[in-house]
Amino acid sequence: RMTDEALRTPTLLEAAQVSKAWPFEEARKLLKRYPDGKPDGSPVLFETGYGPSGLPHIGTFQEVLRTTLVRRAYETLSGGAPTRLVAFSDDMDGLRKVPDNIENKGLLAAYLGHPLTRIPDPFGKYESFAHHNNAMLREFLDQFGFDYEFVSASDRYNSGQFDDALRGVLRNWQAIMDIMLPTLREERRQTYSPVLPVSPKTHQVLQVPVEVVDAEAGIVRFDDHGEMVESCILAAMPSCSGRSTG
């Protein structure tokens, strides 16, 4: 990370203020909201997303690099406002297809649709396929010296850190649907839901309509292959022990 002294170098600041390079153009948009950093002094958050259904690749590198460039541009223009970069892994997503560049494809084929952290590691090294790819991501980013914090979706869901946000989604369900549905094609509208339940029968992530039963308790209802079931999407509620959604 650049030192505060380096960020305040007159020559650098002057160059940054007139630069037409896209990282500075993007940083200026953020500067309008936080000209001197966040009012409470906490770091401005930058975030990248990674889907660990495959190994990290050049696109992964590009996303982290682009975000880092905007982050550094913002730090320069703001005179050194604190920032942090989170590399977020969407490792609760269902496996959509078997990657071409991995061994033991037959093992993965049996787990199509399953959450990535609940699929065995075909390399036989980690707790799951997602854990393996998450480790490869960190190793990949570390090789290039990126300054980041790694966050796993599964860890956040299972620890209950997302419970308050999930309750907020359930409380405001219809308002969210009213915003999202007009943006989707008709086919996707028929199955869209702000949360994706996991089937108790097949253990696959489902894209089906969902009904809120109890927002505070985190209970939802959905069609699981012809059978209506109720399940909980929260981690910290007693009624959610053995929960099947995320």
Where is each model-derived feature located?
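Non-catalytic terminal extensions that flank enzyme cores
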Residues: R1-I58, R72, T76-A87, E103-A109, ...
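Active/ligand-binding-proximal structured segments within catalytic/core domains
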Residues: G59-V70
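A glycine-rich helix N-cap at a beta->alpha junction
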Residues: K105-F140, F144
